[in-house]
Amino acid sequence: MSGSRGNSSNSSVSNNSNNNNNNDGGDERLLFLRSVGERNEIGFPSRFKSAHYKKPTRRHKSARQLISDENKRINALLTKANKAAESSTAARRLVPKATYFSVEAPPSIRPAKKYCDVTGLKGFYKSPTNNIRYHNAEIYQLIVKPMAPGVDQEYLKLRGANFVLK
């Protein structure tokens, strides 16, 4: 029995020493990693990066700033050209050049995409009775054809194509 007591006390002592060793091992590991990090640092500046380079504080301008800057640039060009044109009698009025930033663009020439009012898929067909767009014949047979008169106006209202009788 005395031998087992001694073993248990020895095991607790050895556990404490293991805990100390684990902490020492962690400290050794940190010291090792720090020494490796110090060895990896380059003592001279890289030839690929300028020594005077500063990271810009802001990368992109907001859309409002881009539009206002573009308008200022266009107005400056127009006033300069108008002053030159006032001296000549041939060109009295200058039209601004179309740019990507001009907000006053005409509507698109491309036709608007048409979607099914029921499913949201591409609407290839349009019902002749109530003007509801539908994707295929199955949707027409099951949903559009037996639709009640008030319900079709609700679908058209979602699209903004409803008509109100006064």
Curated annotation (Swiss-Prot):
GO annotation terms (biological process): chromatin remodeling; DNA repair; regulation of DNA-templated transcription
SMART domains, per the entry: YL1_C (SM00993)
Annotated source species: Saccharomyces cerevisiae (strain ATCC 204508 / S288c) (Baker's yeast)
Family the entry assigns: Belongs to the IES6 family.
Main subcellular location: nucleus
Keywords: Nucleus, Transcription, Transcription regulation
Job of this protein: Probably involved in transcription regulation via its interaction with the INO80 complex, a chromatin remodeling complex. Also involved in the regulation of telomere length.
Gene: IES6
PANTHER family, sorted: INO80 COMPLEX SUBUNIT C
Biased composition (Low complexity): 1-24
Miscellaneous information on this protein: Present with 1720 molecules/cell in log phase SD medium.
Pfam families hit by this protein: YL1_C
The protein's assembly and partners: Component of the chromatin-remodeling INO80 complex, at least composed of ARP4, ARP5, ARP8, RVB1, RVB2, TAF14, NHP10, IES1, IES3, IES4, IES6, ACT1, IES2, IES5 and INO80.
Record localization: Nucleus
A single cellular component GO annotation: Ino80 complex
Region of interest (Disordered), residue spans: 1-28
Protein name: Chromatin-remodeling complex subunit IES6
